[in-house]
Amino acid sequence: MAQLQVTLEVAAGDLDAVDGALELAGALSQTYQADDGTVLLEPGVGEHPLWEQVRVDALFPPETDPDALHTLLAGQLGERLRGWQAETLEDRAWEREWLDHFRPMAFGERLWIVPTGAEPELPAGAVPIHLDPGLAFGTGTHETTALCLEWLDGEPIAGRNGLDYGAGSGILAVAAVRLGAACCMAVDNDPQAVVASRENAERNGVAEDVPSYAVDQRPAYCADFLVANILASTLVDLADELRDGVRVGGRLALSGILRGQEQQVMDAFQGGIAWDAPRCCGDWVLVSGTRTA
């Protein structure tokens, strides 16, 4: 399907307002890119890149009238609407652009993220996760997602039940089941993310083992392992809920944490977790541990 792509130049302080306006205007997905070329596709729940200046590429349905869209956004954003560009990405051009950017990527010893439709030669024992060119909400390219994927790859989760809190695309829940977990529930507060999780689970043949729910609609569930890739402030606010989401003796991994924030996150759990040494990737940190009480 062709897409209308709108590009804006956004100051970091205006990003929340612009993000919300684009979503309300019907954006299907958004990509953030810094001046240095760093790309972040559809940040996780509540996550925003900490850059001074951000280029935002937003995709809209092909029937969207760009002039009417500009008028709508200008009315909402005023002077914050800067750098406007609009172009139509035809079917082949859009998919080609995605495939050119996303090569198969390895995480840990076994996991590979592969664009749907690509058939790369992977090493023996590789566990591929297929993602769609039109995917929103995360692809593994961001450091926090990479840290979580590598953690899952190194954990003995075979036959166990997991919980992916703030699942976005469901990439972590899908990866867990593809690595041998019996089940991994994906929960998110964004309805589009719930749909994306279900679609990606179906795409990878694990739909029955990756149930997806809105946060406030999920059934009671206590997991053997839990992974949450959301902002540090949200992890702090949800510490009790996250701790209670995993059984005593179970494992949890938390990311979306900037260097220097890890102690604040761990302290929020007020004991009851035996923490491992933090793992770092760039400016980001993953903390993991075992629930002891």
Curated annotation (Swiss-Prot):
Pfam families: PrmA (PF06325)
Keywords attached to this entry: Cytoplasm, Methyltransferase, S-adenosyl-L-methionine, Transferase
GO CC terms in record: cytosol
Chemical reaction(s) catalysed: L-lysyl-[protein] + 3 S-adenosyl-L-methionine = N(6),N(6),N(6)-trimethyl-L-lysyl-[protein] + 3 S-adenosyl-L-homocysteine + 3 H(+)
Gene3D superfamilies named among the record's database cross-references: Vaccinia Virus protein VP39 (3.40.50.150)
Family, as annotated: Belongs to the methyltransferase superfamily. PrmA family.
Summary of the function given for this chain in its UniProt record: Methylates ribosomal protein L11.
Protein's recorded name: Ribosomal protein L11 methyltransferase
Species for this entry: Halorhodospira halophila (strain DSM 244 / SL1) (Ectothiorhodospira halophila (strain DSM 244 / SL1))
